[in-house]
From Swiss-Prot:
Expression across tissues: Detected in liver and adrenal gland.
NR C4-type zinc finger segments: 46-66, 82-106
PANTHER family in the cross-refs: NUCLEAR RECEPTOR SUBFAMILY 5 GROUP A, NUCLEAR RECEPTOR SUBFAMILY 5 GROUP A MEMBER 2
Name of the gene encoding the protein in the UniProt record: NR5A2
GO molecular function: nuclear receptor activity; RNA polymerase II cis-regulatory region sequence-specific DNA binding; zinc ion binding
Protein name: Nuclear receptor subfamily 5 group A member 2
Chain segments carrying region AF-2: 488-499
């Protein structure tokens, strides 16, 4: 039985976070202030019919009407038919005209069948409780800020200048503190971020995915007669990459055309989060968190890093929950997979960021800021220095392999859909994803890196190394937690406790 706190934590892709501070020499976003009405864009609308939401029902924010409709349909085991073409428009004025299309839309936007009680008693199967509380708190915080200030900050588009590189962690902490006082921040322009997007809303990609049983619709890579699988999708990664905020997950090595990229890999790539937006969310969270702290409550270096890791973990959970194939799994299977690999995904994310970071002797933070490796090493103990050393060795190996974005995406899915996880209800899907991604990765490496005849095998050999580093990192973090050095009430700690339950 999973501990309650952990079960709820994984029902969530939280964008609300906890605090820290950022390097000093950051290019400041220029903001313009405009009149802002609270109702303008904070008022939530039901994703099914567009009516005003009444609260969280069966997995996401919906209106009272769609909540009742969904509950009655599931509890009464109703079966509907559509007299048209099963694509009826569902909105507030005609949501009752076609119950079949309405129910299908409920499912497509993310309402959870398993959250409805079969015994007709009041109260759902609430695996998402703390998510609701956190999300409500975030919305209330936004409302309070807007009402207090009466303005809306809009990041103005501007030419992005190169980030300074001589940054230290201490200056990072000072920078957030300055932001809370209204002092200039050397921070690049942040794109508007969608903090209130529900993690349960179905993405356009996942709605077009085939049934998961056979993974039909994707190229089967049992044989490789042509080594060139054409795709109708444009490939945004073949153009020359440009860093938006100090870094982006660009493709630093290969320049292959979409014709030489397996269709499955292109689909996996589409699931990747927008890195500048992730950076903006984490930065905004750290700034807000620091602004809420008194002078004597500022985070130390380690606390800051924990906050960054916690927010990165939330973005990883959100990525997983919105990804193809993973969405097809029931919540229990999703939780088991994420429980198993969360630290590996964190390490892999950090490793790839360093691979594409070109400056030697510095570490690229998830916020896009660079910190001298020597600065971190001087403040870290023997255990953390050992972990950092192993991570840098792995970075060097992957750089020598010319590790690129598409291979990174494949490894993320191989880590997520691990065959080591026991008692999965839909093990067949997990096994199928493993086989298909492995085959696509093999095809891709052979086609695009023919001079590296064993690149596929070398990439797979890095996975045990990532796991070893992640296990050491977990042990280190847990010991620090027991000593009271890790900020409490965050997803990192919830996951650590869950894994030891």
């Amino acid at each position: 039985m999973l501990p309650k706190v952990e079960t709820e934590a994984l029902g969530l892709a939280r964008s609300n976070g906890e605090q820290g501070q950022m390097p000093e020499n950051m290019q400041v976003s220029q903001f313009k202030m405009v009149n802002y009405s609270y109702d303008e864009d904070l008022e939530e609308l039901c994703p099914v019919c567009g009516d005003k939401v009444s609260g969280y029902h069966y997995g996401l924010l919906t209106c009272e009407s769609c909540k009742g409709f969904f509950k009655r349909t599931v509890q009464n085991n109703k079966r509907y038919t559509c007299i048209e073409n099963q694509n009826c428009q569902i909105d507030k004025t005609q949501r009752k005209r076609c119950p079949y299309c309405r129910f299908q839309k409920c499912l497509s936007v993310g309402m959870k069948l398993e959250a409805v009680r079969a015994d007709r008693m009041r109260g759902g199967r609430n695996k998402f409780g703390p998510m609701y509380k956190r999300d409500r708190a975030l919305k209330q915080q936004k409302k309070a800020l807007i009402r207090a200030n009466g303005l809306k900050l809009e990041a103005m588009t501007q030419v992005i200048q190169a980030m300074p590189t001589d940054l230290t962690i201490s200056s990072a902490i000072q920078n957030i503190h300055s932001a809370s006082k209204g002092l200039p921040l050397n921070h690049t322009a942040l794109p508007p971020t969608d903090y209130d997007r529900s993690p349960f809303v179905t993405s356009p990609i996942s709605m077009t995915m085939p049934p998961h049983g056979s993974l039909q619709g994707y190229q089967t890579y049992g044989h490789f007669p042509s080594r060139a699988i054409k795709s109708e999708y444009p490939d945004p990664y073949t153009s020359s990459p440009e860093s938006i905020m100090g870094y982006s997950y660009m493709d630093g090595y290969q320049t292959s055309s979409p014709a030489s990229i397996p269709h499955l890999i292109l689909e996996l790539q589409k699931c990747e989060p927008d890195e500048p937006q992730v950076q903006a969310k984490i930065m905004a969270y750290l700034q807000q968190e620091q602004a809420n702290r008194s002078k004597h409550e500022k985070l130390n270096t380690f606390g800051l890093m924990c906050k960054m890791a916690d927010q990165t973990l939330f973005s990883i959970v959100e990525w997983a929950r919105s990804s193809i194939f993973f969405r097809e799994l029931k919540v229990d299977d999703q939780m088991k997979l994420l429980q198993n690999c969360w630290s590996e995904l964190l390490i892999l994310d950090h490793i790839y960021r360093q691979v594409v970071h070109v400056k030697e002797g510095s570490i690229l933070l998830v916020t896009g800021q660079q910190v001298d490796y020597s600065v971190i090493a001087s403040q870290a103990g023997a255990t953390l220095n050992n972990l950092m050393s192993h991570a840098q060795e792995l970075v060097a190996k992957l750089r020598s392999l010319q590790f690129d974005l598409r291979e990174f995406v494949c490894l993320k899915f191989l880590v997520l859909f691990s065959l080591d996880v026991k008692n999965l209800e839909n093990f067949q899907l997990v096994e199928g994803v493993q086989e298909q991604v492995n085959a696509a990765l093999l095809d891709y490496t052979m086609c695009n890196y023919p001079q590296q005849t064993d690149k596929f095998g070398q990439l797979l050999l890095r996975l045990p190394e990532i796991r070893a580093i992640s296990m050491q990192a977990e042990e280190y973090l847990y010991c620090k937690h027991l000593n009271g050095d890790v900020p409490c009430n965050n997803l990192l700690i919830e996951m650590l406790h869950a894994k030891r339950a």
